[in-house]
Swiss-Prot record:
Belongs to the universal ribosomal protein uL24 family. Part of the 50S ribosomal subunit. Pfam families: KOW, ribosomal_L24. One of two assembly initiator proteins, it binds directly to the 5'-end of the 23S rRNA, where it nucleates assembly of the 50S subunit. GO terms for molecular function: rRNA binding; structural constituent of ribosome. CDD domains: KOW_RPL26 (cd06089). GO terms for cellular component: ribonucleoprotein complex; ribosome. It comes from the Bacteria. It comes from Paraburkholderia phytofirmans (strain DSM 17436 / LMG 22146 / PsJN). Keywords: Ribonucleoprotein, Ribosomal protein, RNA-binding, rRNA-binding. The keyword rRNA-binding applies. One of its GO terms (biological process) is translation. This is Large ribosomal subunit protein uL24.
Amino acid sequence: MNKIRKGDEVIVITGKDKGKRGVVLSVGEGKVIVEGINLVKKHVKPNPMKGTTGGVEAKTMPLQISNVALVDANGKASRVGIKVEGDKKVRFLKTTGAELSA
């Protein structure tokens, strides 16, 4: 069970974008892509077959999953824990103890 999932609101805790918030767009193997964070400029060649023009595009690149933390109701970074209730695993915030939706 992943502690951070698609759609979670996270805050960057280290790196050049420290303190910025965003929504997780996708989760990969040890990496997350967060909307509007870790933007880099990529040069793109024009391709008339696909109908794309060339130029410089801003692209969102993945971040290490350890460099982001979930945002709690108070707007602060919080670690995530997993507890077992019966036969189900439930994520919860360690700062407030609030359970997160499945």
